[in-house]
Amino acid sequence: MSLSKTKNPALLAGPGDEAKEKVQAALELLHKFGSAFKVDTAGFSFHPESPECDKIFGAYLKNVKHVPTYSSAKTLTSVGGRILYAATCQYVKLTPVTNLTGCTLWEHGWGQNLKCYHGEGMCRKKNEIEMAATSESGVAALKEGRGAVEINRWGRQVVKITQENYVICMEDLQSRFNQPSANSCGLSFSDSDKARSAMENATELTRSIFSQAKMDHLLFMPICCYCNYGGKMILGRQLCKLTPFSISGTEGLREEDVSPVQAVSVRHPAVFVFQCCNATGGSKGKTSCDFKISHADLLQVLNLVRKMWLEVMGYPMPIHFPRFKWSPSLRVKNALLPEGSVNEDENPFGLDNSEDEEEVVPPSPPSPARKRTRTTVAEVHHKKKKKIVLESSEEDE
């Protein structure tokens, strides 16, 4: 593992030579993990944006055979790789310039009222959604009894869903649906009751898995998707989209028939799912990354990375997750910037280069205006009298 193969660790702080020595120590540590789980580490560079730690955790995850809940396999390995990378940095005393775990601890303060990322109470606002009667979402809404067929103002048949428990950030009270204001944190829930159930699930699940941790008032969550990892600023929301998903099939289950961890989801059949900051839900003309992980799987990923570290190193993993603090930089960026594709044609405007350029003669400077003198009547008589005197004097000579 030669340092000549390493990329410039732009997200890592420290003097050049000292940072290189620490990167070399980190590469040796990853080689140790790779040997334990049969991962080739010959070309590793320990760059923050390289998926090297993802490969190591992915190999470990395959042996565990974890069944995800609303999470993609790619996101599970990515988040596990981020945590392993941050732990390795802390082990070799290499200080990143940003939070490379991509995760944080949010002191949500939820009680009787739900609060947004500003720390203020969320506002309830009635919201109505119209969908085509033949669309997949419209048919699903009718089957679930969430919508009704109506004729809209354009005379079209639509499925109308009325969200009575829709809550939004206080800064979006005067904004239209799904169009957050410039001061918004971007947090909203279509069903406040389901969101509350998901938060109760998260609290009790954390208590069940990490029984010694005092986390009743904190939510462990990712804040970076693939779009803004590493402290990047993007258009739109700056924090992962937080959505409560229902856990189906819990009807008829008794808590005593399942494990204590599973019993949490029987009592509170909803779970938070974190997605791309600007997840579009399949909207045309918009793109989003495929980041998707549930809170339950996020806890399991942290647990598995800790177990993996303990198996290889023989002692607990060093890791630190910062507290979430609201900052104006996390507000929704609503700038409308012009887009366009790059055209590499040499002559896109059809200029004829064979034609000689006409010589441009600079215009001559304007001549100064002559000053017109004004002659009075007295001056005219004086000149005539002077002329007569001159003529008479010539005759005398």
From Swiss-Prot:
Q: What is its main location?
A: host cell
What residue spans carry the region label C-terminal arm, DBP binding? 335-397
GO annotation terms (biological process) = DNA replication; DNA-templated transcription; positive regulation of DNA replication; viral DNA strand displacement replication
Its Gene Ontology cellular component terms are:
host cell nucleus; viral capsid
Cellular location(s)? Host nucleus
| Ranges annotated as biased composition (Acidic residues) | 342-360
Family annotation (InterPro entries): Ad_DBP_C_sf, ADBP_zn-bd_sf, Adenovirus_DNA-bd_a, Adenovirus_DNA-bd_N_sf, Adenovirus_DNA-bd_zn-bd, ADV_DNB2
Instruction: Note whether Membrane occurs among the keywords.
Output: no
Q: Which Gene3D superfamilies match?
A: Adenovirus DNA-binding, C-terminal domain superfamily/Adenovirus DNA-binding, zinc binding domain, Adenovirus DNA-binding, N-terminal domain
Query: Which GO terms fall under molecular function for this chain's record?
Result: DNA binding; zinc ion binding
Where are the residues of the annotated region Flexible loop?
Answer: 129-161
Entry keyword set = DNA replication, DNA-binding, Early protein, Host nucleus, Host-virus interaction, Metal-binding, Phosphoprotein, Viral DNA replication, Zinc
Residues passing through the membrane, by range: none
**In the UniProt record, does the keyword Zinc occur?**
yes
Q: Which residues make up the binding site for Zn(2+) 1?
A: C116, H118, C169, C185
Region annotated Disordered sits at 338-397
Q: Which residues bind Zn(2+) 2?
A: C225, C227, C276, C289
Q: Which domain of life is it from?
A: Viruses
Q: What is known of its domains?
A: The C-terminal arm bridges DBP molecules together, thereby creating a chain.
- Identify its protein family: Belongs to the adenoviridae E2A DNA-binding protein family.
- Summary of subunit composition and partner proteins: Homomultimerizes on viral ssDNA bound to pTP. Forms a initiation complex with viral polymerase, pTP and hosts NFIA and POU2F1/OCT1. Interacts with host SRCAP.
Explain the purpose of this protein.
Answer: Plays a role in the elongation phase of viral strand displacement replication by unwinding the template in an ATP-independent fashion, employing its capacity to form multimers. Also enhances the rate of initiation. Released from template upon second strand synthesis. Assembles in complex with viral pTP, viral pol, host NFIA and host POU2F1/OCT1 on viral origin of replication. Covers the whole ssDNA genome during synthesis. The complementary strand synthesis induces its relese from DNA template. May inhibit cellular transcription mediated by the interaction between host SRCAP and CBP.
What is the protein name for this chain? DNA-binding protein
Source organism lineage? Answer: Viruses, Varidnaviria, Bamfordvirae, Preplasmiviricota, Tectiliviricetes
